[in-house]
Amino acid sequence: NFLFVKKDGKDEIRLIDWEYAGMQDPHVDVAMFCIYSLYNKRQVDRLIAAYFTEGCDDEIRIKIYCYIAACGLLWSNWCEYKRNLGVEFGEYSLRQYRYAKDYYRIIQNELKKQKERGEE
């Protein structure tokens, strides 16, 4: 969902999620948008750069990566549950599991880099 607003005389677009509005960390919506769009890491990072026009610090970026991993696991588990009820999602389930697995590794690498820089 997109909201068109004016800020300081300029037209801006905001990404919103009416289903979960006000009930969670807004960074979950960024992560879910990436998952639903089947973005790769380069596309995820480009979206984060576009969304955070003032810049995004590493802590928030890693948090979004964590949400991508957690939400990928959530949706892959949901697909498995539905499969047991006779509903097949094909490749979608595997893609969601890959988000969980791949972003877990990305998070581990990012945290390792922070530790090496003394930024724990």
Model regions: which residues?
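Active-site activation/catalytic loop segments of kinase-like enzymes and analogous catalytic loops
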Residues: 26-56, 69-87
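Conserved short-loop catalytic and cofactor-binding motifs
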Residues: 18, 35, 64
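Short amphipathic alpha-helical segments and their helix-coil junctions
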Residues: 44-63, 100-109
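Secondary-structure boundary motif
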Residues: 7-8, 53, 85, 109
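ATP/Mg2+ or Mg2+-diphosphate-binding catalytic cores
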Residues: 77-120
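Start-of-helix signal in alpha-solenoid helical-repeat scaffolds, especially tetratricopeptide repeats
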Residues: 62, 66-70
